């Protein structure tokens, strides 16, 4: 019996399936069915985009936005609860910025033309932030506040010039997740801010530091200049830090490297407009953050998905990154591993997007200049993905290195280079792969590890398992021996009892005299 129990114990500790070492995403309750469920492909794509932009200043991080009033509340076609549920669903689908119209009414701040208080809105906002506050799902969120001054009777109790907005934010959301003007001043004073050209005393922190070091999630900007900012220390004066176009874009389409660089020096480029599926992607490609003002009712809210599907992933194709499993028979005849990314250039419309490609396919690679993110060339020769490993002979020209575009403007620089060199449709290797762990897309070559899951090679796994297996076998042999061959003391139990009885007769009770 002891042997059977030990065998069971060894099986449980050694052979049982190992759980994933990554942090599991919290399930966020889905109460609406207007938009399709967020697929794993979209989740992997959003996560890979965020991770590759870890060193990008936050003012250059691309994001899609929605105007809450125009999309849900205008003309009163949606009830308040439905609008809040749609707001939650948009955040779950990757929308990162929202325009919020506020007006003072009944001694409190209310969302324009609705019965939704700003406090109630922030409670829904906080629910999403708390539910996504882990290294798999954390992202930056921006609220663009439009303040209606209101009349004196309506504004009584809301605080002069918005002074009680700070109290509302403290009570409903909390200071710890908000990046404030004081935080920015501190970072600039101590040299922790950057622009696209490097360290900059008037720049912004990089995304990785913002999310993981400072543990911030939210930036609030007021774009109507109705607040006294000494009374609202959590809110940025939007007119001094962002470029907001409404209706029509005022920034031209850059056609040279210098023009792209100049465009990248403009912080927080937003365009509020009614978009179509044909134009919204074009604005993303030239560095704008579209804020959708299209009007939707309960019956047609799902139409917004067409716009999101084209823009949430500025890098990958809408149906990528796919998980492609090759059959055993195919592996026997050729080397196959669909764990590498390639930039697919289409010459017909001078566009580019990323595809999952077989790592052993032969392509050229994209090389970035060491001192300028907007100067790119094609590698000298063709090779499989592993041929572009940093340990291999460099296939990039001097002062260039194998890389990938980290923003839409960098990708625009690539497409213009390919256009000027009359490149045909082609695939080019970029520094993105999931070689370590399937569906965990990382940069840094094939040796890069997945930060969310521990990868164990077969050789290392055998090395780890062998000592445990040998020890378990020895223990089993000992247990088997003890069960089969009895110890002599058990065979002579009666003799031992007689000896003990005789010895006990010589023991003296009490204290000797």
Swiss-Prot record:
Ranges per topology, Extracellular: 23-460
Protein name per Swiss-Prot or TrEMBL: Maintenance of telomere capping protein 6
UniProt signal peptide: 1-22
Domain of life: Eukaryota
Entry annotated with the keyword Ion transport: no
Topology in the lipid bilayer: Single-pass type I membrane protein
Pfam families linked to this entry: TIM-barrel_MTC6 (PF25506)
InterPro entries reported in the protein's UniProt record: Telomere_Capping_Maintenance
Stretches of the chain found on the membrane's Cytoplasmic side: 482-513
Glycosylated position list: 79, 115, 130, 135, 151, 154, 161, 164, 237, 248, 262, 309, 349, 420
Subcellular location: Membrane
UniProt main location, coarse: membrane
Gene behind the chain: MTC6
Organism of origin: Zygosaccharomyces rouxii (strain ATCC 2623 / CBS 732 / NBRC 1130 / NCYC 568 / NRRL Y-229)
């Amino acid at each position: 019996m002891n042997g059977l129990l030990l065998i069971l114990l060894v099986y449980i500790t050694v052979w049982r399936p190992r759980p994933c070492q990554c942090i599991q995403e919290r399930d966020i309750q889905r109460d609406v069915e207007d938009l399709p469920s967020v697929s794993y492909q979209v989740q992997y794509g959003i996560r890979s985009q965020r991770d590759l932009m870890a060193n990008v200043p936050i003012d250059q991080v691309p994001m899609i936005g929605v105007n809450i009033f125009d999309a849900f509340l205008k003309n009163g076609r949606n009830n308040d609860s439905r609008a809040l549920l749609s707001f939650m669903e948009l955040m779950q689908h990757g929308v990162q910025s929202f325009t919020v119209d506020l007006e003072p009414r009944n001694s409190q701040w209310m969302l324009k033309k609705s019965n939704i208080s700003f406090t109630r809105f922030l409670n829904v906002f906080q629910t999403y932030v708390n539910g996504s506050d882990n290294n798999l799902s954390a992202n930056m969120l921006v609220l663009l506040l439009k303040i209606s001054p209101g009349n004196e009777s309506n504004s009584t109790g809301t605080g002069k010039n918005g002074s009680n907005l700070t109290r509302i934010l403290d009570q409903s959301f909390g200071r710890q997740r908000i990046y404030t003007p004081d935080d920015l001043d501190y970072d600039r004073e101590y040299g922790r801010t950057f622009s696209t050209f490097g360290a900059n005393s008037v720049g912004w922190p990089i995304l990785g530091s913002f999310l993981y070091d400072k543990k911030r999630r939210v930036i609030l900007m007021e774009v109507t200049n109705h607040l006294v900012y000494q009374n609202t220390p959590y809110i940025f004066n939007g007119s001094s830090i962002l470029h907001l176009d409404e209706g029509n874009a005022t920034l031209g389409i850059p056609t040279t490297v210098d023009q792209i660089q100049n465009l990248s020096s403009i912080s927080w480029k937003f365009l509020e407009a009614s978009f179509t599926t044909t134009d919204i992607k074009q604005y993303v490609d030239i560095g704008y953050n579209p804020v959708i003002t299209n009007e939707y009712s309960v019956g047609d809210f799902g139409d917004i998905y067409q716009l999101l599907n084209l823009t949430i992933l500025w890098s990958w194709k809408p149906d990528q990154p796919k998980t492609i499993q090759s059959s055993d028979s195919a592996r026997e005849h050729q080397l196959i591993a669909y764990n590498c990314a390639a930039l697919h250039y289409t010459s017909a419309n001078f566009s580019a997007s990323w595809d999952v490609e077989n790592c052993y396919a032969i392509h050229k690679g994209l090389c970035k200049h060491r001192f300028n993110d907007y100067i790119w060339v094609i590698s000298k020769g063709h090779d499989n993905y592993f041929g572009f490993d940093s340990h291999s002979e460099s296939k990039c020209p001097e002062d260039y290195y194998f890389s990938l575009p980290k923003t839409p403007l960098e990708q625009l620089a690539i497409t213009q280079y390919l256009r000027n060199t009359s490149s045909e449709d082609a695939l080019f290797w970029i520094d993105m792969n999931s070689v370590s762990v399937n569906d965990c897309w990382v940069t840094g070559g094939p040796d890069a590890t997945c930060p969310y899951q521990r990868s164990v090679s077969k050789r290392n796994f055998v090395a780890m398992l062998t000592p445990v297996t040998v020890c378990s076998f020895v223990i089993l042999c000992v247990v088997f021996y003890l069960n089969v061959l009895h110890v002599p003391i058990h065979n002579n139990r009666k003799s031992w009892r007689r000896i003990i009885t005789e010895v006990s007769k010589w023991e003296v009770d009490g204290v000797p005299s």
